[in-house]
Structures are given as C-alpha cells and as structure tokens.
Design a protein with these regions (language model features):
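Extracellular carbohydrate-recognition regions
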Residues: 113-145, 317-318
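Extracellular ligand-binding interfaces
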Residues: 179-183, 192, 200-277
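C-terminal functional module detector
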Residues: 49-62, 70, 74, 80-84, ...
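Domain-core and long-helix interface of multi-subunit machines
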Residues: 27, 316, 345, 362, ...
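Short carbohydrate-recognition loop motifs
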Residues: 145-178
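Extracellular polysaccharide-targeting segments
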Residues: 295-327
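N-terminal secretory signal peptides
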Residues: 1-19, 28-34, 38-44
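Extracellular beta-strand ligand-recognition surfaces/modules
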Residues: 201, 264-307
C-alpha cells in the first residue's frame, strides 16, 4: 500500500472544523484497526437539514481546481496569463501551474546549428531543418540549398556551412520559402522560456530587400488571451539605415532590422524588450520561444536570396531559475487576488511527479552522463523525489500513470496488457509514496475507464491515494474545447493553500469534466466517515452509504459502486454496482443505500450524462472493520 502522510497543520484562526477534521488529524503513522475497537459502535448519524448547495455538513465549501498546467517554461505555447484567463472564464478558483523542472532550469539546454546537413546531432538527439508551408506560387529556381564551406566567419566549426534561401514568385503577389530549425527529436531543447537564453544567428542578404521582399527570422512565442499565439518577424532590410518602431497586428509583430547587402550580420533579438514594445499589456517574462523559422519572401520583380549561418542559443550564466519562475507566479497572484495560485512543478523523472503547493525546490538529480537520458533514473530516485516534495510541504502527485505517449488509447488485448503492466508496476512501487494519482485523464496511453480501473486496483489492495482530475494543458486557451478537460473539485474550509493541500492529502475531492459537470459531490458512511476517510467501526445492518450531489445535469445518472479490499493484486475483485439513481433523486441533495458486505470495503460513485458517458466521479469512502489487515493512514482514520 502507499505510504502514510504527515499530519495537517492547524486550521487558520477564524475557521472551525467539526469533529470530522479533528478526528482524522491523529498523527503521521498508519493505524492498523485493532480488535479492541469492536465495542466502539455508534448508531448512524441522525438526519440533519441539508446544507445549502456549495457547502456541506462539515462546513466545507466546494471549489474548482485546474491542475497540471504547463505555461511558458514548458515546451509548447502555453502561458500563465492564458490559463488565468480561462480559469476566470470557467469559474475555476484554484490554478496550479506545473512547468517541467528541468525546463525551468534550462538543464541540458543551449544548442547550436552549423548548417552542415539537414539534421545535426546534439547531446540530446538531433536538430533538423524542416520545410514549412510557404506562401504563393514559387518559381522552379526558388527553394533551399545547403552551402558547404559557406559559413559565417564566426563559425569555425569543422564542416560548418550555410543555408541559402531563394524566393521568387511566378505572379505579382509575394511568395515565401520557410524552413524551421526544429529540436523535437532533441527533447525539444530549443523550446521554452525566453528568460535566461540569448539567440544568435548570422545572416547575409545577397539581394536588396524592403518591407515587401526580404530575408527574415520569425520567432514563435506563447499564446496570449487577448491576441492568441504571438510571433515576431525580424525583417532584414537593405533599404534602411536605422531601426524603426515595431508594427503590430494582433499577435503578429514585425521588427525591421537594417543590414548591408553582401555582408554578414549577427541578429541577436532582445526578446524581453521586443515583447514589451510590441505588446505593452503582456508580461514579457510569461513567454516562450517555440519556433525559429528562417524566411525568404520575394515577388515577380524581386528575387530574394541570402544565407543563414551559425544559429546558437546561449544560456545566460546569471539566470536564476527559481527567481525567474517565482516572479512570474507572483505577478499573477498579485494581479488576481481572488484566485489561489500555489507553487507547483512537474518533476519529470521516468514517472512524472507533480509538486502541488509547498516550498519551491529543484530536485538534485544524479548525473547520468548522458543528456539524452537525463530524466531516466528508476524507482529509487522517484521515491526519494516524492519524499523531498513532501518534506517541502508539498503534495506529491503520480502523473499520467500510463506514461507520456500521445497516441490514441489502446484497445482489445493491447489495452488489457497495458492495464496489467501498470497495475503490476504501481503495486510494486507503492506509487513511490505519492499522495495523489491523476485518474481524471483520458489520454496518454489509456482511456478514462482504464484509469478508474487502475485506481480500483490500488483501492482493492489497501492503497490510500487521492484521485485527481487534470488537463495537462500545454496551450492555455479554450479549455472547454479540450478532450482532457478534467478539474478537481476539493472540499475546503476556506480558499487557502493549507485547506487545498488538506483536501488532496485526505481525499476530500471529486473530479468533474469541465463544461459537463463542475458541481459538488460527496459520500459518507452514516455521515460519520466522509469521502477519503475510513469508517473503522464494527459493521451494522443499519449502516448507510450516503451520496450527496449538487449541480447534476438533466438526464444524469449516478452509479454507486462497492468493492472489497481483498489484496488480490492485479486479479483483484472488480467493484460491483450497488445502485443507480436519477438526477431527480437528488432534489434534496442526497440519497442513501445500505452498506453491503462485512469485510473491508470501499465505495465510490460516478456521474454519467444522458448518453452514458462518465462526466464525474468521487474518491472512495472506506469501511474498515476492527481487526482488518488494512493499514489506515492516521489522517484518514475515523474511529
């Protein structure tokens, strides 16, 4: 089973917790339910007037948390401003940014391209020159060639060359040739934050150029909630002798750079200053460098030709990753005081682990000596990493448990094999001691049903984790259009980081699919032990599982499941359905069903829409009779 968790700190002054929260904070050790507790029987709690929607019998409030969000320090186009904007638009009160740790650190970043070939080796793989869609109708003489020995004098590397681009249109309109320097097969190590890195590229214009026909370098930046994806095109112009003001249309900016025809010129964009000049309302530091595209744009009259050489990204030796990351988070905390934005980070070892809240830190990875495998370490390092997250007062999440593949989830025998393999792995590793697992997840190697079955396997084998729902969004726009748009719905005593971490550690959270369900769900045994907790009393025929649900969509069905804690490994007894309830059954907020069985068990429920698709689910509540061979974490134990 997974390891126990530390005791929660006392609630903030001014807040009260009922006996439920007092009882669960017993200590850091697990509690093996003793036979001496058999006399501590109590009748089911008396019925009480239902609380108003959004609150519960424990004086907790339901919140929405968007977790596992990648922004400008990661490898795609997300920005924290985009996530914040989407959170506000969708009524989400908790935003947990979790960029990759090694990308924030620029670990094994840098990189050079010498234009000696269409692909060049790097310490982590390969950078490549990839043709991108052009514009217009190009002549047959247009295109790209590598010029051996044609490198800029600054590149003294043996075999260094240059890329010649030629663009001429068959029509009066312009035509464009475009090639990207791509690092996808090198851990995407050219992509990431604009902070701490300086781009250099040498260019020689062999033809005249102007605002219409030119050589250019186009840099893709992060998404902006107001402008969409941003990009800056640096036009190299022989008709200018001095820089001009940028021209900006929405997310597209153009900066003209004077150059001399026939002479090498080193382009070194000052990205922070340029972003600030182009989009004054945006935070420049909340931007990433996502693409580097080399351009030649010509027309029928003017053939544009020129050379590109020695592209290299240098890491600033004064770059402070901790300060850089913290400053971006703090900017949005100050600007959005109504949101909770705790520290977060995805520590990206073999099995990625998110730190949710706590003090920011960077794990000291062992040096493998091989940059291409610098995130591959094994279970011992993963377990130590989780312990370090917890030592820094963070909640540790086991992320996308079926891996990082982005292909469609497997079906048939391949799906069964993937499930069996991962069940075996998490049982053997005890989830490395993590507090949570991403179960609300519908991609990366498995569908939602498979994630739920994996979590049932853990529950049936006596492992106490909290199931969360996440998006793993790297783009930061239009959350409702995403397939993987799960949010975690924690019950909290106030919108504070400590209350949030308590909910995650104790299992006081359900999961919903944003746009389909973001109400509130809870369940309990006799209104004594609630979702995430273990009811540790002698079973009684009068015991009831009580289901609370608010905000159910019309036509929804709630299905209650019960499963035995049988320690059956991957062959555990799958949970069985106890009852279905229509949405109208919850007119007063709750329904109940008899707690069946005599041995240790767990109960959870799902919400299906009118078409039968699961749109929400709860964490389990446990029924662990005295004398059961189940080690209950002290913070989940209810005598």
């Amino acid at each position: 089973m997974c390891e126990s968790h530390p005791v929660e700190p006392a609630p903030e002054e001014g807040h009260t917790r009922r006996s439920f929260l007092t009882r669960v904070a017993l200590g850091a050790s697990t509690v093996l339910v003793p036979g001496t507790l058999r006399g501590l029987l109590g009748a089911p709690a008396a019925a009480a007037a239902p609380p108003p929607p959004g609150t519960n019998y424990l004086n907790e409030t339901a919140y929405r948390a968007a977790m596992h969000l990648h922004a400008a320090f990661s490898e795609v186009t997300g920005s924290l401003s985009g996530h914040i904007s989407q959170a506000i638009a969708n009524g989400v009160g908790i935003v947990v940014p979790t960029d990759h740790d090694w990308r924030i650190q620029l670990r094994h970043y840098g990189g050079q391209y010498h234009f000696s070939n269409w692909s060049e080796p790097t310490p982590s793989g390969y950078w490549s020159l990839l043709r991108r869609p052009g514009v217009g109708s190009l002549t047959t003489t247009s295109g790209a060639t590598l010029v051996s020995g044609g490198a800029a004098p600054a590149d003294q590397t043996a075999g260094a060359g240059a890329l010649r681009l030629v663009a001429c249109s068959t029509k009066s309109s312009i035509a464009k040739v475009a090639y990207e320097v791509d690092s996808q097969t090198s851990n995407a190590d050219a992509k990431g934050t604009v902070l701490g890195r300086v781009l250099h590229i040498w260019v020689k214009a062999d033809s005249t150029s102007n605002a219409r026909t030119y050589l250019g370098v186009q840099l893709g930046l992060a998404n902006d909630p107001g402008y969409g994806p941003k990009q800056i095109t640096y036009r190299l112009r022989t008709d200018l002798t001095a820089p001009t003001q940028p021209t900006v249309t929405g997310g597209n900016a153009v900066i003209d750079v004077p150059v001399l025809r026939g002479q090498w010129f080193e382009l070194v964009p000052e990205l922070l200053a340029d972003i600030a000049a182009c989009w004054p309302s945006a935070l420049p530091e909340d931007n990433s460098l996502n693409s580097m595209v080399l351009l030649a744009v010509g027309d029928k009259v003017t053939t544009v030709s020129g050379l590109f050489s020695y592209l290299h990204l240098e890491t600033d030796p004064t770059y402070d990753p901790a300060a850089a990351y913290s400053s971006v988070l703090q900017h949005y905390r100050v600007a959005n005081p109504g949101l909770l934005v705790p520290n977060g980070m995805e520590h990206s070892v073999d099995t990625h682990k998110c730190q949710l809240g706590g003090q920011q830190f960077f794990y000291a990875y062992p040096d493998t000596g091989d940059p291409s495998t610098h995130t591959s370490y094994g279970s011992a390092v993963a377990a130590d990493l989780v312990a370090q997250i917890q030592a820094h007062d963070g909640v540790a999440s086991y992320n996308h448990p079926f891996g990082i593949v982005t292909t469609s989830p497997p079906i048939g025998a391949k799906r069964t094999a993937a499930l069996t393999a991962q069940m075996t792995a998490v049982l053997a590793s005890k989830c490395h001691g993590a507090d949570c697992m991403e179960v609300g997840y519908n991609s990366r190697g498995m569908d939602l049903a498979g994630h739920l079955e994996l979590f049932d396997c853990l529950s049936a084998n006596g492992a106490f984790l909290t199931a969360t729902g996440v998006s793993d969004d790297h783009v930061g726009k239009d959350w409702l259009a995403q397939n993987n748009r799960f949010v975690t719905l924690p019950w909290m005593v106030g919108l504070t980081e400590e209350a949030f971490k308590t909910a995650l550690r104790v299992g006081r959270a359900s999961v919903g699919l944003l746009g389909n369900f973001t109400g509130s769900l809870d369940l309990s045994i006799n209104r004594t032990a609630y979702m995430g907790q273990a009811y540790c009393r002698v079973p009684s025929a009068a015991d009831q599982v009580v289901l609370d649900a608010y905000g159910l969509p019309s036509g929804a069905t709630v299905s209650l499941y019960g499963g035995a804690v049988d320690f059956g490994g991957v062959g555990f007894q799958r949970p069985s359905k106890i009852a279905d309830f229509g949405a109208s059954s919850f007119a007063l907020g709750s329904v109940s069903a008899p707690a069946v069985g005599s041995g240790p068990r767990y109960y959870r429920f799902t919400v299906q829409d009118s078409g039968g698709a699961v749109i929400a689910f709860t964490n389990p509540v446990w029924q662990i009779p005295p004398g059961s061979p189940v080690a209950v974490p002290a913070n989940r134990f209810v005598p």
